[in-house]
Every structure is written in C-alpha cells, then in structure tokens.
Swiss-Prot record:
Its EC number is 4.2.1.126. This is N-acetylmuramic acid 6-phosphate etherase. A lyase-type mechanism (elimination/hydration) is suggested for the cleavage of the lactyl ether bond of MurNAc 6-phosphate, with the formation of an alpha,beta-unsaturated aldehyde intermediate with (E)-stereochemistry, followed by the syn addition of water to give product. GO terms for molecular function: carbohydrate derivative binding; carbon-oxygen lyase activity; ether hydrolase activity. The active site is at E86 (proton donor), E117. Keywords: Carbohydrate metabolism, Lyase. Coiled coil: none annotated. Pathway: Amino-sugar metabolism; N-acetylmuramate degradation.
Amino acid sequence: MTNISLDKLVTESRNENTKNIDRVETLEMLKMINDEDKKVAEAVEKELIHIAKAVDKIGEAFFNGGRLIYVGAGTSGRLGVLDASECPPTYGVSYDLVRGIIAGGQSAMFKAREGAEDSKKLCIKDLKNINFGKNDILVGIAASGRTPYVIGGLEYANGIGATTISVTCNPESEMSKIANISIAPVVGPEVITGSTRMKAGTAQKMVLNMLSTGAMVKTGKVYGNLMVDLKATNEKLVERAKRIVMQATGSKREQVEKILKETNFDVKLSIFMIESSLDKIKAKEILDKNKGYIVEAIKEIS
C-alpha cells in the first residue's frame, strides 16, 4: 500500500460548491451536478498532448502484433471493460485486441469486490493469464493514482519492457510516476465527496474513448468518419452497414445491397469495389497491400 494519505488527494477533498446539496430543491441539485460536470471536458483538454502520445503508441503496437490492455478496480475497471467490449462490434477487431481486466474478475463487474484492489500480485497473475507481453500496451486506470492492483500491473509491464500508460485524476500520483505516459485530467473535488464514479469516472471514460477511437482511426478502421470495419451482426448493424456504404460512395441502395451481398457484408471491401470499379478479388488484393487503408488504396489506383 502506498503511503499517500487520502486527505492529500484532490479526488478525496470536499467540494465547497456542493456542501448544501442535501438542502436544495431537485432542480438546483441537478444544476450543481451539471455545473461540476462542465469542468470535465476542460480537464481532459489539458491532457490532449499526452493522450496523443498514447494513441500513437497504441497504433504502433497494433501494427506490431500488440494488444491494448486496460486494468483497473471498481468503477475504473468497469470503464476499461466497457471500452474494450465495444471495439469488436464497432471496428471488427478480435475480442483479444482490446481487453479490459477488472480486479476481482468478471463478478466484480456487477458486485463490488473492493478488497481485490489491494493486491499487486493479483494484477500480475491476471496479466500472466492472458499472456501479456512486451509488444502489448498496458493502460492502468485509477482515479486516485494509488491503487495497488493497478500499480502492480504497471510495475510488471515495465519490467518486461511493455509500454505503460496511466489514467488518473490526481496530479503527481504514484501511478503517473511509474507509467511511461501519464494522463491526468484533474477534475477537482467530486459533487459527493470521494464518489469518483462521477466526474473522475466521466473523465476516464472520455480518455478511454480517445485512446481506442484514435488507435482505430490510425490503423485504418475509419474512412472519413465512417466505421468501415464494423461487423453486421444484427438487423440494426446490417442497416448501418448499408447506410455507411451509401454515404461513402453516393451509390443507390440497390447497388449497395448487391455489393454487400457479394462481399458477405464486408463494408470496407464493398466501398473500395464501388470506388475503384474493381472486382472483389483485385479490390481485396489492393486493400490488403495497403493494410486496409481505403484512402491509400484509392491513391494506388489513381
């Protein structure tokens, strides 16, 4: 356990603006919460340089066969699992490429297991169980920046030569000193003292959105602002796939449906086939050569 006392942590300090939140009308209470929430995006903005460095490292790792692994406890762990779980349906990647690990295991997603966060060894064990290696990226998430479970993971990852990133909401935390890249949006005291699921959790979610989205953009999973590697696994996504191809190419629905059927709903390939007027085999060959970047593939045939 780190020797940083809780009373020195910004996330544990008392918010002067909400001291009477229990004595006001409902609307005023919600205005207090909303006013505090407005500070979150500004805090994240101040960390954009560090977030950009992290995104570049993650994209580089993906190209080298590495993965993005989130570790955290409680709310922080759940946010990592949430972000990771959205990547496969959105970007068509494997469930192994971006993974979230929460202290205490799967059951901790639904029922708090607070004691699990106090063990450094537990995180090391969890990382070994997924064969975490030096080509992978470890993102440690903890509002306080002092959670032993996460610190143990960062120390282990550093020890094997992997890139480490910390996402905290306290300046100069122990985690920020351990990680190769520190991202620390300081959102100030919480509306309810110490309830870091609120502003700190929102800030962490915003940062994780940027990390995963940025890395996917950097690795060709997005064309314009369209998710061209999504998997059409249900009716909503089938319809979205059609709309994406129509928006990207300006083609009529009938043509798009025909091409998507031919490519087995490979959105990216369908777009490039229409844009290039190439058959499926040749279009796939050029796309693969350009690592899935539609823009680069179009340049090659221009």
